[in-house]
């Protein structure tokens, strides 16, 4: 019986023989089977079903952690069985909200001024400037009905994310119809919009930072570094606007309302939760369940992000429930590009439980319409009807055709901007003053070097959200290897802190050495950036180093492709963590992996960080003494310099070729919220002592070479720490260098 064997060849194999099948049914002896030229693919997750969407690993990791807090909160809500239970929860939520956002500034003189009046049929528009804080000016227009008898209700209209603010035609329709129905309306410019642009550039007649949301995130990031939320200033401007309304003899203090659309809906929810004077609240296209928002559309901007909010058990729906049973109308559209309708429905259902328990279920309503992100005619009618109902105003709620005013007519300042008219302070200025107190405390702590270093070790782990490896990393997984001249490149993955893998390219010299010094190589553009033949990594390998080029979570293969760029950083903020802290944990895990290799000297493992990757690396090195030496190339010199200067850049956020409209994409993946309450990057450098550290080409807050003066100022403490540890010679600071290899060699000396 004959047996037939079939040779199955992959597509990359070619038979270099002529007419095999026509000349013979068997392979000739001299047949040459060879591989066709193959281009290297250095993606570790190539053809890997489980990790086939690595761009979602970071956000999913953060969502999973947030869900733990959401589940705890859901359990608390399920146990509320009486009006008394809900009242106790409301008090608890109020305390937490004040802890998260406050303390608010002291109330000072509003110093209101009227800069002009527009008279129209049936009403007038007064142009108002007031000071919510000394020298912090807010512009607005007050719509006042004619022929007022007694006192009338008043509504604060806070505005969503459009650049012209209340001058936008949609908001004019709202203001016009409310005032025609006998209600005073005060529409104000939020920070970063209208005439309250925070970074106005007269040369381009626009913000030098970008559109309103970009400004909000820009100064919001500075606030986060100082351990606060910029939401405080949006809320405070609104509360002080209500203070102004109550100075008007026409206003009924018992009939105060607030409404807003989109970002204005956000601030509406905030003000109504914090200010008990608000009787009626109408947040439009905002109120939703935090859980659903996070898993669908993701984080929106800095003012919607409460520092450690979710970790403290506070969610968006709490903002509705804390004011029960006061009248509240939610409006939403089904095809919203930014917000989740399912979440809004669930928020309504949960809040309805509270209103039911208070015996006033009718005080909470929700109206939906099928539309994109907008206030449709149906929704506008619902707004007018709801206010008229709860303010006891008779008449027809139907919408009238509004007479539009031009932006020029509604201009409050003669120059069109507060900054070019009165100057005054912006959010940056106020936050800088608050931060100066933190810096002063930090300098005092640094005087006791040993105690300060011990404190930094503890507080930096807590604030950054660093999680130490638990020793359960498991075995590495190999997904391919290439042989190059003199060394090999292996594609490996090791377990991260959660349900994700850390991709590594392992470069190993093909020599006869029993043990090698090893390096973790971190580049913000990913592990493949210098991985090609002739790149920096090859040079290091040919000097005898084992190199683990790594994509920590959120970088390279795992860079976020699943959501908006700001989502990762802000999702970490709400759970009390940071992308930097998570990445630092990844680095320590890679070091542990290197220590397990038989051809690596576990006492000679160093690390190289390029640009932004210096941030997680210096955290990791401060926390893990097994990182023997560190080379930082182009590191930002401090977080302090970012907060204490009006303008800053970070490499992960620069938008190439964006023009002035969006010159920045302001994510927060580089930041650690609350960092300046306890430490800064120079303190972490001090924690590395007495191990070797190289600081090459330090960058200032604009990513320009740091000046000698700035370097002296920021590195004063780490120099003191190295001297204290009798290792002054182990800290090297250079502005330029001939080769990376020379710096690495020095660090291993």
State where each predicted segment sits.
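Bacterial N-terminal signal peptides
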Residues: 7-16
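Alpha/beta-hydrolase-fold serine-hydrolase catalytic core, especially in secreted/extracellular enzymes
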Residues: 23-137, 324-326, 331-503, 507-516, ...
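Primarily recognizes the serine-hydrolase "nucleophile elbow" in alpha/beta-hydrolase
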Residues: 181, 240-312, 590-678, 683-684
């Amino acid at each position: 019986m004959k047996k037939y064997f079939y040779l199955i060849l992959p597509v990359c194999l070619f038979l270099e023989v002529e007419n095999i099948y026509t000349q013979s049914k068997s392979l000739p002896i001299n047949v040459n089977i060879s591989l066709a030229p193959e281009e290297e693919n250095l993606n570790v997750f190539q053809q890997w079903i489980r990790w086939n969407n690595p761009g979602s690993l970071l956000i999913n990791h953060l969502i999973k952690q947030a869900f733990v807090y959401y589940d705890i909160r859901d359990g608390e809500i399920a146990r509320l069985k009486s009006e008394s239970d809900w009242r106790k929860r409301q008090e608890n939520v109020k305390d937490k909200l004040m802890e998260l956002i406050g303390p608010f500034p002291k109330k000072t003189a509003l110093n209101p001024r009227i800069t002009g009046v527009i008279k129209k049929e049936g009403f007038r528009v007064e142009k108002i400037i007031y000071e919510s804080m000394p020298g912090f000016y807010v512009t607005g227009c007050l719509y006042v009905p004619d022929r007022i008898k007694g006192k009338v209700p008043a509504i604060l209209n806070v505005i969503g994310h459009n650049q012209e603010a209340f001058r936008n035609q949609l908001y004019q329709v709202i203001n016009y119809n409310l005032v025609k129905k006998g209600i005073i309306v005060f529409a104000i410019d939020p920070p970063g919009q209208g005439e309250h642009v925070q970074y106005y550039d007269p040369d381009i007649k626009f913000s030098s930072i970008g559109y309103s949301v970009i400004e909000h995130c820009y100064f919001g990031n500075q606030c986060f570094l100082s351990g606060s939320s910029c939401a405080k200033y949006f809320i405070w401007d609104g509360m002080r606007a209500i203070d102004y309304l109550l100075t008007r003899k026409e206003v009924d203090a018992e009939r105060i309302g607030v409404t807003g659309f989109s970002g204005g809906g956000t601030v509406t929810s905030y003000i109504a939760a914090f200010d008990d004077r608000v009787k009626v609240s109408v947040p439009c296209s905002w109120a939703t369940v935090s859980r659903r928002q996070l898993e669908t559309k993701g984080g929106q901007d800095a003012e919607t992000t409460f520092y450690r909010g979710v970790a403290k058990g506070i969610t968006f729906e709490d903002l509705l429930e804390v004011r029960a049973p006061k009248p509240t109308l939610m409006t939403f559209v089904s095809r919203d590009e930014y917000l989740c309708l399912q979440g809004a429905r669930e928020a309504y259902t949960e809040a309805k439980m509270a209103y039911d328990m208070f015996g006033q279920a009718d005080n909470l309503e929700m109206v939906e319409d099928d539309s994109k992100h907008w206030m449709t005619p149906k929704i506008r009618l619902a707004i007018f009807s709801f206010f008229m109902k709860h303010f006891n105003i008779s008449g027809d709620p139907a919408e009238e055709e509004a007479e539009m005013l031009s932006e020029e007519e509604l201009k409050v300042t003669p120059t069109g901007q507060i900054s070019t008219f009165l100057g005054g302070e912006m959010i940056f200025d106020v936050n800088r003053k608050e931060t100066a107190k933190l810096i002063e405390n930090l300098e005092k702590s640094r005087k006791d070097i040993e105690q300060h270093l011990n404190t930094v070790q503890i507080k930096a782990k807590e604030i950054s959200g660093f999680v130490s490896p638990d020793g359960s990393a498991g075995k590495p997984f190999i997904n391919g290897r290439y042989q190059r001249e003199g060394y090999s490149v292996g594609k490996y993955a090791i377990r991260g802190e959660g349900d994700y893998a850390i991709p590594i390219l392992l470069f190993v010299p093909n020599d006869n050495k029993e043990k090698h010094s090893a390096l973790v190589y971190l580049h913000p553009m990913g592990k493949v950036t210098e991985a090609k033949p002739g790149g920096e990594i090859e040079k290091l390998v040919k000097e005898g180093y084992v190199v683990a080029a790594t994509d920590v979570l959120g970088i390279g293969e795992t860079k976020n492709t699943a959501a908006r760029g700001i989502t990762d950083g802000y999702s970490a903020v709400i759970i009390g963590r940071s992308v930097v802290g998570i990445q630092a944990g990844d680095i320590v895990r890679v070091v542990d992996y290197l220590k397990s290799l038989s051809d690596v000297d576990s006492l000679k493992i160093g690390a190289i960080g390029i640009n932004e990757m210096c941030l997680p690396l210096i955290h990791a090195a401060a926390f893990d003494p097994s990182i023997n030496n560190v080379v930082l190339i182009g590191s930002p010199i401090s977080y302090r310099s970012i907060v204490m200067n009006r303008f800053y850049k970070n490499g992960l956020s620069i938008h190439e070729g964006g023009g002035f409209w969006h010159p920045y994409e302001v994510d927060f993946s580089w930041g650690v919220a609350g960092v300046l309450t306890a430490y800064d990057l120079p303190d972490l450098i001090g924690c590395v002592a007495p191990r070797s550290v190289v600081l090459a080409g330090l960058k200032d807050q604009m990513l320009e070479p740091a000046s000698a003066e700035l370097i002296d100022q920021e590195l004063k403490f780490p120099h003191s720490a190295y001297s204290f540890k009798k290792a002054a010679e182990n800290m090297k600071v250079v502005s330029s260098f001939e080769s990376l290899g020379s710096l690495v060699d020095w660090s291993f000396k």
